[in-house]
Amino acid sequence: MSTMTINGRVEPLPDDPESLLIDVVRDALKLTGTKLVCGAGVCGACTVLVDGVPVVSCLMPARAAAGKSVTTVEGIGAGKLHAVQKAFMAHDALQCGFCTPGFIVEAAAFHDRWRASKGTATPSREDIGAALSGHLCRCGAYVGICAAIREAFEAGVTR
């Protein structure tokens, strides 16, 4: 039986070749922070990290996660709030909240990659926009979301 590590725990993967990663995350493991919205990989609400890389879990076969490390929104921050999560709270960067988990996972990965490669420099609006280009917010909370992400960088807090 194949396994993956999800949020630090080793979990079995189903043998069903039709099973998607989102199904395992939400239905089998009851990690319901990850949302299924479009089912076509265009909204970003189902974003998780696979070996540190953001992927849309609604398109990824569960079997493709075998031997890999998966992080859901519940695992971001490793037991404490990530700088992005703190900034989202400070800026009230959500409305209905359905897109928020995907934005947080993507933004946290972007934050950590940026810090690792560019140190304390703050990304431009264009850099932030490019990092979030695969995410949709039906409520239009983009101004607050981008402000929160920018603050996560300006605060100088990494974790």
Where are the language model's segments positioned?
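Signature of N-terminal electron-transfer/Fe-S-associated modules in redox systems
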Residues: M1-R159
